[in-house]
A protein has these predicted regions:
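Short amphipathic alpha-helical segments and helix-helix/interface helices
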Residues: 19-23, 130-134, 182
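RNA substrate-binding interface of SAM-dependent RNA methyltransferases
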Residues: 1-4, 11, 26-33, 54, ...
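Structured adenosyl-cofactor binding patch, chiefly the S-adenosyl-L-methionine
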Residues: 53-55, 91-95, 105-108, 112-122, ...
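Glycine- and other small-residue-rich loops at beta-strand/loop junctions that grip anionic moieties
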Residues: 77-78, 102-104, 170, 194, ...
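Glycine/small-residue-rich loop that forms an oxyanion/phosphate-binding "nest" at active or ligand-binding sites
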Residues: 18-56
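Short, charged/polar "capping" segments at the starts of alpha-helices
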Residues: 13-20, 110
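Active-site/ligand-binding-proximal alpha/beta "capping" segment
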Residues: 145-197
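Short basic, glycine-rich beta-strand/loop surfaces that mediate nucleic-acid
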Residues: 50-54, 117, 163-171
Length: 220
């Protein structure tokens, strides 16, 4: 995934055990040892598998690099909960999303986001969205804002299935997408619901959207 290993920290018993293969693959980097309690303190949870690795982040991709050949992308706009970000990435990897764009409030490398994603943050190309959606239009994308408004269309509307390149925009927990983002979108899309339920958690809504709005022939 382009992340350069810098150092390893593991329980001493794992140096010749579970960590041996990892140490060999990482090459000539420092290997430190510590007690299990220390590893748990650093990670924030007790399940560590006994090995931690510090890595250098690669240089961020440009939007053009990761979106030029993409057909379905997701824009995570203002989502701050690490659990939701991790879950969205896992669904994106499983359901055919080609790239993820994030606003600065959303960090996929938060340790909880990485854990919840089951490592999917290292599988799906992602980068920061620091401009308006006009750049997506320049790359040939139509935008679909997931929001409940008086003028939103159902997620199963046939028009959406015909779009060769579609950017699905998911908003923050609670407030959802801003009025400006909704006004700028090519489509405003809602998920039909029953039993007087009017909304879903953003991660759950993302999974529904990714499946329903998948690219034509993507499941063949």
């Amino acid at each position: 995934a382009g992340y350069e290993p810098l150092a390893l920290l593991c329980e001493r018993k794992h140096i010749t055990g579970d960590a041996a293969t990892i140490i060999e693959r990482c090459g000539n980097i420092p290997v430190y040892t510590g007690k299990r309690e220390l590893l748990a303190t650093l990670t924030g949870y007790t399940l560590t598998r006994g090995v931690l690795c510090a890595m250098r982040r690669p240089k961020p991709h440009s939007i053009e690099e990761i979106c030029r050949e993409a057909r379905r992308i997701v824009v995570i706009d203002g989502v701050v909960d690490a659990t939701n970000i991790g879950a969205i990435f896992r669904s994106a990897a499983a359901l055919g999303i080609d790239a993820v764009l994030l606003t600065p409030t959303s960090c996929p490398l938060n340790r909880r986001a990485v854990r919840v994603s089951m490592g999917s943050v290292f599988l799906v190309p992602w980068t920061w969205l620091d401009t308006t959606f006009s750049k997506l239009h320049d790359l040939g994308f139509r935008t679909a804002a997931m929001a409940l408004t008086d003028h939103s269309i159902s997620i199963d509307n046939p028009l959406l299935a015909t779009e060769p390149k579609l950017a699905i925009i998911m908003g923050t927990e609670g407030d959802g997408l801003s009025y400006e983002t909704i006004a700028e979108a090519d489509y405003v899309v809602r998920i039909p619901m029953s039993h007087d339920v009017d909304s879903l958690n953003v991660a759950a809504a993302a999974a529904v959207a990714f499946w329903q709005l998948r690219a034509p022939d993507s499941n063949k």
